[in-house]
Swiss-Prot record:
Positions carrying Phosphohistidine: 213
Protein name: Phosphate regulon sensor protein PhoR
Chief place where the protein resides: membrane
InterPro entries reported in the protein's UniProt record: 2-comp_sensor_kinase (IPR050351), HATPase_C_sf (IPR036890), His_kinase_dom (IPR005467), HisK_dim/P_dom (IPR003661), HisK_dim/P_sf (IPR036097), PAS (IPR000014), PAS-like_dom_sf (IPR035965), PAS_fold (IPR013767)
One Gene Ontology biological process: regulation of DNA-templated transcription
């Protein structure tokens, strides 16, 4: 078994080398010369092994060292073992770095590693996408030269990282940036895209502002009449008008609350529970009678219904979607308009559509029609009792049925609303 070199072994090797020279020198009478030749030979042998070792370390790419004898054998063997250990450690370190980078790439955030001065030495793919960095082209670049925002520069220079920085990019994207010390004189920067969260917060504020605005008008009317009735009793036609107006405003508030509850119920409903068998033809017959009553013969109707076409889904949601589309056509088209309602098979499922030949909708309004409380004609919507929630309800209801609301409109020619229930939700016994 090989062991490390010791003084005893080196002295023993020297004695074994000099012993033959001592015997021969004593025998022939040239002891100093034989000893000198022996030591010189030993030095030449050591220098030759040094050259072999140098060649192996600097030139030869082989993992196995040259064979050694004597005191060189444990030395070369030890170097070989050290090289194997280093190779194993490099492999482990490489695997660790790969796992770190793989984990960093899997993060939903942009990750950038920089020096204390801001020099970039690594970033993940999301950092390239969100922050516009290029790797490896930006390796060594100062991040302050790439993200030129005064608030970001100030954030890094003050070195107060106790709170995140909210940064709005030139693209309109909102970022939440956190910086923390990583290792000695290095920083870890994590940037999270909070654009959607910012939009949701804005939508929430707008929602409450719109609800407050919608309730303020009827409450103001009710308060005005109540104050009037408190000051003096109302009689005759004035009293009837006041009661009629108050009744209209309470019905308007009741309708708004009902639609808000319907929308909230649809949004909270689980999307996977679509196991009710819905008789859409029967539902449409009821909607047809209600539409005729609502229209008061101002519009004409055509209902083209496949009486055998039934679907699986949520009956309340489909009723809300269908009735809202039909009633919207009645409420938002002028007298003399013809409205066509169809429920029929199409190649990819069952299509419901409501089409009219009314004035149509301007293109700039179409993308926003399904927003809550959005109205094309606010004055007319309030006259007809519209809350601005109908199409938002339709959108969420059809989305829960794996469909989407399609809106086609041409100014002066008319509008068509439609959605397609996918084939897999059509009841098996439908003709």
């Amino acid at each position: 078994m090989l062991e490390r070199l010791s003084w005893k072994r080196l002295v023993l090797e020297l004695l074994l080398c000099c012993l033959p020279a001592f015997i021969l020198g004593a025998f022939f009478g040239y002891l100093p010369w034989f000893l000198l030749a022996s030591v010189t030979g030993l030095l030449i042998w050591h220098f030759w092994n040094l050259l072999r070792l140098s060649w192996w370390l600097w030139v030869d790419r082989s993992m196995t060292p040259p064979p050694g004898r004597g005191s060189w054998e444990p030395l070369l063997y030890g170097l070989h073992q050290m090289q194997l250990r280093n190779k194993k450690r490099r492999r482990e370190l490489g695997n660790l770095i790969k796992r770190f980078r793989s984990g960093a790439e899997s993060l939903p955030d942009a990750v950038v590693l920089t020096t204390e001065e801001g020099g970039i030495f690594w970033c993940n793919g999301l950092a390239q996408q969100i922050l516009g960095l290029r790797w490896p082209e930006d390796n060594g670049q100062n991040i302050l030269n790439l993200l030129r925002y005064p608030e970001f520069t100030q954030y890094l220079k003050t070195r107060d990282f106790s709170r995140p920085l909210n940064l709005v990019l030139n693209t309109g994207r909102h970022l939440e940036i956190r910086v923390m010390p990583y290792t000695h004189k290095q920083l870890l920067m994590v940037a999270r895209d909070v654009t959607q969260m910012h939009q949701l917060e804005g939508a929430r504020r707008n929602f409450f502002a719109n609800v407050s605005h919608e309730l303020r008008t009827p409450l103001t009317v009710l308060q005005g009449y109540l104050e009037m009735m408190n000051e003096q009793p109302l009689e005759g036609a004035v009293r009837e008008k006041a009661l009629h107006t108050m009744r209209e405003q309470t019905q308007r508030m009741e309708g708004l609350v009902k639609q808000l509850l319907t929308l909230s119920k649809i949004e909270a409903a689980p999307t996977h529970l679509l196991n009710e068998k819905v008789d859409v033809p029967m539902m449409l017959r009821v909607v047809e009678r209600e539409a005729q009553t609502l229209s008061q013969k101002k519009q004409t109707f055509t209902f083209e219904i496949d009486n055998g076409l039934k679907v699986s889904g949520n009956e309340d949601q489909l009723r809300s979607a269908i009735s809202n589309l039909v009633y919207n056509a009645v409420n938002h088209t002028p007298e003399g308009t013809h409205i066509t309602v169809r429920w029929q098979r199409v190649p990819h499922g069952a299509e419901f559509s409501v089409e009219d030949n009314g004035p149509g909708i301007a293109p700039e309004h179409i993308p926003r029609l399904t927003e809550r409380f959005y109205r094309v004609d606010k004055a007319r919507s309030r006259q007809t009792g519209g809350s601005g929630l109908g199409l938002a309800i339709v959108k969420h209801a059809v989305n829960h049925h794996e469909s989407r609301l399609n809106i086609e409109s041409t100014v002066g020619k008319g509008t068509r609303f439609s959605f397609v229930i996918p084939e897999r939700l059509i009841a098996k016994n439908s003709d």
